[in-house]
Amino acid sequence: MIYKRSSQLFADAQKVIPGGVNSPVRAFKAVGGEPIFIEKAEGAYIYDEDGNKLIDYINSWGPLILGHAHKPVIDAVIEKAKKGTSFGTPTEIETKIAELAVKMVPNIDKIRMVNSGTEACMSAVRLARGFTGKEKIIKFAGCYHGHSDSFLIQAGSGAVTFGTPNSPGVTQGTAKNTLLADYNDLDNVRKVIEANKEEIACIILEPVAGNMGCIPPAEGFLEGLRKLCDETGILLIFDEVMTGFRLAAGGVQERAGVKADIVCFGKVIGGGLPVGAFAARNEIMDYLAPVGPVYQAGTLSGNPLAMAAGLAMLTELDSKRGIFESLEKKTKYLHEGMEKVLTENKVDFTINRIGSMISVHFGTEPVTDFASAAKSANLGVFNKFFHGMLENGIYIAPSAYETWFISDALSYEDLDTTIAAVDKVAKTL
């Protein structure tokens, strides 16, 4: 494929934007080469500035679960935009999307809208600290909760890719209150709690890790965390920015049957526009300003265009619950097809999948945590695989540590085309 215009646009962008991108993973530094610039997208496909058509497995890093330019979402945004783009006042549509989210998600009474997943997680931790009166938090190595200072301590994806799991600019004062534990290791979590008795406000985690590849929770892990939190008074925060409204209408809480105290959302809830949210039971949410002492605010929080997109998206997912079964079947079909051709081509690999989230690791050991993800990354093989897939019209995440997100817009013909491309590329690895 030819990427002449993308190359020129990247050169232009680097003159006025740091690294030429507004989020590091987009720069292709992890895989080499130059990023492609997208002109438009529809359904399962993206079209770059050079006219190349690609089957998309990123879907804007997860929000576009029904595919690009989904008509009900686009129509809702257009109609709302005709009435104005932002008011800085309450609007009816904020209440409507809140009512629908509370209906769909178990164990929440109220929800606060913000502008990103980072903001949601940052606010949730502040709320947990305010509610409990304690300062320390536990996060898991390799789990990513956005670029807030408290979370850039052995974060996943971009931080790992660039070899800088601790970002300059994060102070020791901030870092000392973030305690690290190993994902899928309850004994390790118990030890961390024991060493910091009566000091921990919350445990925050991706209930399905998505930033060290896709790593589902081990059997009993989430249940064990719930039990530990009940025993110690620590709040359990599920960062469902990736999994919320994707793995089930009610997210991981519904799918796994495990209750969180606070839940964070992003991606799908905005329908492709910038939206984050955090939610909990009344007792916790009523600690938020203006009714409680914990301050949180935002000029564009609850923006009417974003709320229109989110409401249209959630309405589709709520009214057509068969979408989740369809996504499960399509992702399983892709999983089994890739597994077959990679095995036939004698490639060392493991594939992790849950629902419509999937990742390929080029190693033979099971990938269950940060250490095993790093061991199985095999960046040289992955980078060759990435560029081979791109050359064959398939756009996957440009990082060995990122999850692929399946949209329901994908047809089985698209999946067969993808499996054939994997077969072709595997012969070169």
UniProtKB/Swiss-Prot annotation:
Lineage top rank: taxon: Bacteria
CDD domains for this protein: OAT_like
Record's keyword annotation contains DNA repair: no
Subcellular location: Cytoplasm
EC number(s) stated in the UniProt entry for this protein: 5.4.3.8
Cited InterPro entries: 4pyrrol_synth_GluAld_NH2Trfase (IPR004639), Aminotrans_3 (IPR005814), Aminotrans_3_PPA_site (IPR049704), PyrdxlP-dep_Trfase (IPR015424), PyrdxlP-dep_Trfase_major (IPR015421), PyrdxlP-dep_Trfase_small (IPR015422)
GO annotations of cellular component type: cytoplasm
Enzyme class: isomerase
Co-factor requirement: pyridoxal 5'-phosphate
Keywords assigned: Cytoplasm, Isomerase, Porphyrin biosynthesis, Pyridoxal phosphate
Residue numbers bearing the N6-(pyridoxal phosphate)lysine modification: 267
Family according to the record: Belongs to the class-III pyridoxal-phosphate-dependent aminotransferase family. HemL subfamily.
Protein name listed in UniProt: Glutamate-1-semialdehyde 2,1-aminomutase
This protein's encoding gene: hemL
